[in-house]
Amino acid sequence: MATIQIKNIGPITDTGIIPLTSVMLVIGKQSSGKSTFLKILCFCRWMEKLIMVSDEEAISQYTHNLKFLKSMKQFHRFNDSYFSSASSIRYEGDTITITMENILSDVKILRKPEFETVRYNTKLSFIPSERNLVSVIRNIDQSYRSAESDVLFNYIFEWGEAKDSYTAEHPKRLSFTDNIEYINDGGNDLVRLINENKMIPAYYASSGVQSAMPLDVMADYFTGLVGKNASVSKHDLANTLARYLGKDKELTNEMLKSISNKMKYQSVQLFIEEPEQNLYPDSQRNLTINLVCALKQAMPKGRGDSMLVMTTHSPYILSTLNVLIAEAYAM
């Protein structure tokens, strides 16, 4: 089982060794390190995904010139004050290990012995607490500016990708309410009141809809990608074939299987900050159940480990997961 341990980063003193399960909930008071944990875990999982689908240069690139730490700080907007000489990360993934002993030395990234046979492609998405920005700021995809790609830039990009699938002919029924659908009308975000057959721009929707709608839509879209072809550039495909053909004159069934695992998404990993935002307890429950169900439906379609990791302040989210666990054990 994959694990992670984080010490002396931001509010975190020592997480201990935490096993990574398919559904994880990090609950606690504000400013206790929940988001810090989520962001570091997400970055380590992304690092593993990059190495699994890339060529030999990926490890070398991130184990020199402090690139691992610099990239993590830049993407997740960590301040320098979060780190000290005592900061450390120990991540043991499915196919690699990452060890950061301090901020002055490069990380060590090692492939596990079974790397070549186990490696696979996975779809990751970090859905931040600021997700309602895509609803409350018009044309945010055109107005948001960042000197470098960061978590918000990436989120806005992924939202644009996800919402394209949900048109008037194929709307997304929102799980946290029983009377609203999401529709992308030529790039405009609309919600339809089903009982009244009335369209409302998301800009004018309630705060609960503005917060939960992007989460609901993106979770549905990305869990639906498992088992489908991944977007792979011609350059990456050529490098993959060259690496295998460089070892042998012809492709074996094992090599073809490994290539196939890279060409299709074998799992999905969702990292969600505060899914409860602006939602009534009953709506929190419905949204949580839908997220778990979407993950469960995606799992049989791939061979990798799918994950749903959430941070929350809400006892209702915790209670819902406890009930689901109790029901699973009862079965």
Language-model features, listed with the residues they occupy:
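Switch/communication elements of ASCE P-loop NTPase nucleotide-binding domains
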Residues: 1-50, 196-331
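Secondary-structure transition/turn motif
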Residues: 92-95, 103-104, 193-198, 204
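Bergerat-fold GHKL/Histidine-kinase-like ATPase
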Residues: 174, 183-188, 196-199, 212
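P-loop NTPase switch/coupling surface
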Residues: 1-186, 301-305, 319-331
